[in-house]
Swiss-Prot record:
Binding-site residues, Zn(2+): 494, 498, 569
Parts of the chain on the Periplasmic side: 92-174
Designated name of the protein: ATP-dependent zinc metalloprotease FtsH
Disulfide bonds: none
Biased composition (Acidic residues): 10-28
Amino acid sequence: MEDKNIKDDEILDDQNDNQEDVQNQDEEKEIKPKKPKKKVYISDDENAEEIKKRIESLKNKNNNISFRVKPPIFFFLILILMSTLFYFYGNKTALFQEKREISYTQFVTKVKQGDITEIRESQEKLTGIKKVAGKVEVFETNKLTDRLGQDTYLMEISKEKNVNIVVLGTPVSSIITRAIFSFAPLFMLLFFFYFINKKMMGSSGGVIGNPFNIGKGKGKISERPNVKFSDVAGLTEEKEELKEIVEFLKNPARFEKAGARVPKGVLLLGEPGTGKTLLAKAVAGESEAAFFPISGSEFIELYVGVGASRVRELFKDAKKEAPAIIFIDEIDAVGRRRGQNKNGGGGNEEREQTLNQLLVEMDGFDTDQRIIVMAATNRSDVLDPALLRGGRFDRRIEVSRPDVKGRIEILKVHSRNKKLASDVKLEDIAKITPGFVGADLENLLNEAAILAARKNSDEITMEDLDEAVDKVGMGLGQKSKIISKRDKDMLAYHEGGHALAATLIPGANKVHKVTIIPRGDAGGYMMPLPEETLGKTRKQILAEINVLFAGRAGEELMMDDIATGAYSDIKRATELAKLLISSVGMSELGPINYEHSDNGFMLSSDLSNETAREIDLEVRKLLKFKYEETLNLLRDNKETLEKIATLLKEKETVTGSEIRALVSGSSVNEVLELDDEQLEKYY
């Protein structure tokens, strides 16, 4: 009885072990440490009922266990299991018979000796079977020929020895294997596309990844923009024009009473960074309208008809959210003039279909729907005329570069969250940044803040701003770059020549700063302080040519040699000379414009060979005369040029006030001793 109890307990422990192994396969079950086996001696009379209950409990737990296997893993496990079963089914003799791999020569010898009574031919092997006294021996070798019937020698021996020959069919395992390997690439490809599709749907909200939504618009309903007109500085006239759009979206009845029709479309024209997108957001923010931003290139896709479908979807969504503003950035990507590509092409046809749909949609909504289409581009010359006619983009607003006043306002807006030192004068920064747009000025202040942070300062100083202007305008300074004495002298005379000519020649721009510190691609540079005018006069253009030539003239005069550093100066001087002669008619050839005409397809010249030769001669004559004139000017002021070069080699960076002090007669030492207040009178 005691042995029986021990045996029952061991069975119970084994069941516990099996149960624990099953539980370990369940990912969601807590893994418990395996307890050591213990032999418990109990009496059969007292504990028989308890043992039955424990066994029943274990059975119930086994029934409740569920195997949670991920579908892809489960699929592959089933596939492997089926392949294994088919393999063993097709080769069942391999499970129960011992095989001996022998050579072909040994195989033939055994047939001769009568050791093989049956030969079985498969696809790649010959299997010889010998049955003696109920025992079976199996010999296997590789086939010498594709088919056994082609092996005449072995066939003759087999016939003599009365060997039974059996040709086996293709094993089931081979069929399954072939099927698996045939269809596996297809299934893998389908699984790959399914996986990529799920990923794209997850990352794009189902719009891009779902092939049934391929035509849905990519424009997203933005939260009501919190940008106001007060956040847009330097664009006074542009904001005044757009205030009418805001009033229409907020109070359309006012315009309807007067019988006025508000423009359906507003086209913002301007160079990159001038604030076109910011203006569109400000209109939406002021009018509290839904904002649908989209790029023109997002309409064009690989599939034909997708662009037109997205246009329809975009306008459909906008009508649901009215009042709404649809903003198409870089509209020239989809709104180019039709018919220019004479070679055809699917991409061009798709773009034209998209443009046609856009034109139809802009005609299809009424003004009472309170939907405004705004677009931005810097290539208005390539837009299709149908876009610009009345009833579509019939209001065009030029967003120009800001003037000095506008730049001051922009700097004030972008410096709201920055701490400026007491010496900072934003007016001075605005004066030395002509041509900078809002994006450039924002970047300038950000660079200045980074420079201040490098010095562990929480204030931006005027020095930081001045360095940021150079970095944004010319590139990173290379103060650690080693320059030979000869190169330093050449740079000093080159930049000194520019500065001297700009100071002496009437009509030239004032000098703001001169430096011989390499920055970007330039070995040094002279920064002018140009006056902002509506246009340039002939005198100003000629003075600029003189200043450009002064660098090369300074090298030739003081070093008796010239360098390649004047390449960009000569190129710019040649462009100005051609502008003067062939474009604006300010030469002896008369007020005639000789520019090439653009017929929309290719550039073609209307000039005769004789006229082109006259223009070339006139350009050469003008440039040669201006260079000689500049060389004579520097020769007459050689001592002043030497002083400027000496000061540049001493300080590396010289202000315009110091240059003007040297030209007025001060020595280098006197200028070095001047303080800021004393230099102020030379500003």
